[in-house]
């Protein structure tokens, strides 16, 4: 069966919409949560905010979130999204994250999205901070140079998996079914069983031809 996946959101979230989406996937910012934002869209938008707009707080909490929740990311989709980015800094960030998460073999392909020299997270002062405090061990040996202490790592800045599963339907379904398009489809159907195939494909960034393959005519639960 031939099919294609609609992996790319129309526009990356930014501003207040991004903040509410980040809260919606379990990050501690002062904003109301967006209901069930797409995980990969939100993670990519957060990395753009951090790397292109130098928002170190977003980047710090994003890294903490990855340390807690990486197992439930659809890495196939994230890899494709990152590969579509023209920003070398965004690609380098995800290459660094994949290097850190290399015990999960799904991240191997993501690490290949950046093949350039090591970049500095900070615009200035990297060498000084490295001499003073050393390197953040999460980034050691990866494509991004980050001095220790620049990106704080506080587990209290993100919800636990149990807490996030209570408020995010797709995350909960991914825990049950695995981090896949199929889990996201079922999460959408949990919210609205009347969705047409076209609507379901659009909501989950999945082309119509994949629906029968993943769900099946009698695969209802």
Task: Give, region by region, the residue ranges found by the protein language model.
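Short helix-coil-helix linker/hinge
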Residues: 175-183, 194
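N-terminal, charged low-complexity regulatory/assembly segments
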Residues: 1-132
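Short amphipathic alpha-helical interaction segments
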Residues: 205-219
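Short, Lys/Arg-enriched N-terminal segment that forms or immediately precedes the first helix
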Residues: 160-175
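A short acidic, leucine-rich amphipathic alpha-helix
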Residues: 196-203
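Secondary-structure boundary elements
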Residues: 191-196, 221
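Hydrophobic residues on short alpha-helical segments
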Residues: 186-187
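Eukaryotic acidic, serine/proline-rich intrinsically disordered low-complexity regions
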Residues: 127-159
């Amino acid at each position: 069966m031939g099919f294609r996946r609609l992996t790319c959101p129309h526009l990356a979230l930014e501003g207040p919409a991004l903040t509410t989406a980040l809260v919606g996937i379990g990050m501690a910012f002062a904003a109301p949560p967006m209901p069930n934002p797409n995980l990969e869209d939100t993670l990519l938008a957060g990395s753009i905010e951090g790397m292109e707009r130098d928002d170190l707080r977003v980047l710090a909490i994003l890294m903490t979130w990855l340390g807690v929740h990486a197992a439930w990311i659809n890495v196939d989709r994230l890899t494709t999204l990152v590969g579509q980015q023209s920003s070398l800094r965004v690609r380098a960030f995800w290459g660094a994250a994949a290097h850190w998460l290399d015990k999960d073999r799904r991240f191997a392909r993501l690490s290949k999205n950046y093949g350039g020299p090591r970049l500095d997270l900070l615009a200035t002062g990297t060498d000084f901070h490295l001499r003073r405090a050393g390197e953040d061990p999460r980034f050691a040996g990866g494509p991004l140079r980050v001095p220790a202490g620049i990106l704080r790592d506080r587990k209290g800045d993100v919800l636990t998996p149990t807490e996030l599963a209570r408020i995010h339907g797709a995350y909960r379904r991914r825990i049950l079914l695995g981090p896949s398009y199929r889990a996201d489809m079922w999460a959408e159907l949990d919210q609205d069983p009347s969705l047409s195939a076209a609507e379901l494909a659009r909501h989950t960034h999945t082309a119509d031809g994949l629906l029968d393959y993943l769900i099946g005519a009698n695969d209802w639960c």
